[in-house]
């Protein structure tokens, strides 16, 4: 499959939504980054017709619920000149693909167990020329630094992977010293936090405000003893 741009009128509408949304999040986008994000929406819509990557079909809702939702975490993750990032259960590439676009100095790895999703991620990487992005297929708990992945990660993030306690249990062996696990959630996950495994703790909880989306969003940062 090759990238297909959305019809001009639709792309213009999406571009205005993206520009306004990114500005409200205090995320500056270059022309290249903006165009890559819009091309990503077009690719996601095209592949979704065949591979069912997301339940959201409308391009404007894709932009809000996928792109802007992913961009909303960027200000909280920044502060590193470079970072190694693992996106667990990435699906259609969220949020990792968005992070790779807006943070070109970060090395981002997308992980999923479904081959067709990895195929979409790989194709999107090629079409958008994201040299800082890699894709690995398999269960996160089986990934080994120096084997399936090059090394441990400073940031391990997930948007829709699992219960927080399960996420921490499965991914904690991949956290680099000084690194953290970051979970994107809807309503504040009090019950999930209460079930966090021994040797892990919440460092901070942030309420996210996603432009044009009337829904609760939270970002939870978890530290694990292995990364101290």
UniProtKB/Swiss-Prot annotation:
Predominant cellular place of this UniProt entry's protein: cytoplasm
Write down the chemical reaction(s) this protein catalyses. guanosine(527) in 16S rRNA + S-adenosyl-L-methionine = N(7)-methylguanosine(527) in 16S rRNA + S-adenosyl-L-homocysteine
Q: Which Pfam family is one of those matched by this entry?
A: GidB
Q: Which residues bind S-adenosyl-L-methionine?
A: 89, 94, 140-141, 159
One GO MF term attached to the UniProt entry: rRNA (guanine-N7-)-methyltransferase activity
Ligase as a keyword?
Answer: no
Q: Where is this protein found?
A: Cytoplasm
Q: Quick one: a GO cellular component term?
A: cytosol
At the top of the EC hierarchy, this enzyme's class is transferase
Which keywords annotate this record?
Cytoplasm, Methyltransferase, rRNA processing, S-adenosyl-L-methionine, Transferase
InterPro entries per UniProt: rRNA_ssu_MeTfrase_G, SAM-dependent_MTases_sf
Checking Gene3D superfamilies in the record gives: Vaccinia Virus protein VP39
Q: What is its EC number?
A: 2.1.1.170
Q: Does the keyword Nucleus apply?
A: no
Q: Which PANTHER family match?
A: S-ADENOSYL-L-METHIONINE-DEPENDENT METHYLTRANSFERASES SUPERFAMILY PROTEIN
Q: Which family does it belong to?
A: Belongs to the methyltransferase superfamily. RNA methyltransferase RsmG family.
Function noted in UniProt: Specifically methylates the N7 position of guanine in position 527 of 16S rRNA.
Query: What name does UniProt use for this protein?
Result: Ribosomal RNA small subunit methyltransferase G
Annotated source species = Burkholderia multivorans (strain ATCC 17616 / 249)
């Amino acid at each position: 499959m090759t990238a297909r741009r959305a019809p001009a009128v639709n792309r213009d509408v999406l571009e205005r939504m993206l520009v306004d949304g990114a500005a409200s999040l205090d995320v500056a986008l270059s022309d290249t980054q903006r165009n890559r994000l819009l091309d990503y929406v077009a690719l996601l819509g095209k592949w979704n017709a065949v591979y069912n990557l997301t339940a959201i079909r409308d391009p404007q809702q894709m932009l809000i619920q996928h792109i802007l939702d992913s961009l909303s975490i960027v200000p909280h993750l920044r502060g590193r000149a470079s970072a190694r990032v693992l996106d667990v259960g990435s699906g259609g590439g969220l949020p990792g693909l968005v992070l790779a676009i807006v943070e070109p100095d970060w090395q981002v790895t997308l992980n999923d167990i479904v081959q067709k999703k990895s195929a979409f991620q790989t194709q999107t990487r090629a079409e958008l020329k994201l040299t800082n992005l890699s894709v690995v297929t398999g269960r996160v708990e089986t990934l080994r630094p120096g084997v399936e992945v090059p090394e441990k990660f400073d940031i391990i993030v997930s948007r829709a992977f699992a219960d927080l306690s399960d996420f921490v249990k499965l991914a904690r062996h991949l956290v680099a010293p000084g690194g953290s696990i970051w979970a994107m959630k809807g309503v504040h996950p009090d019950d999930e936090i209460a079930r966090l495994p021994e040797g892990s703790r919440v460092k901070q909880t942030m309420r996210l405000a996603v432009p044009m989306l009337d829904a609760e969003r939270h970002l939870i940062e978890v530290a694990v003893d292995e990364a101290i």
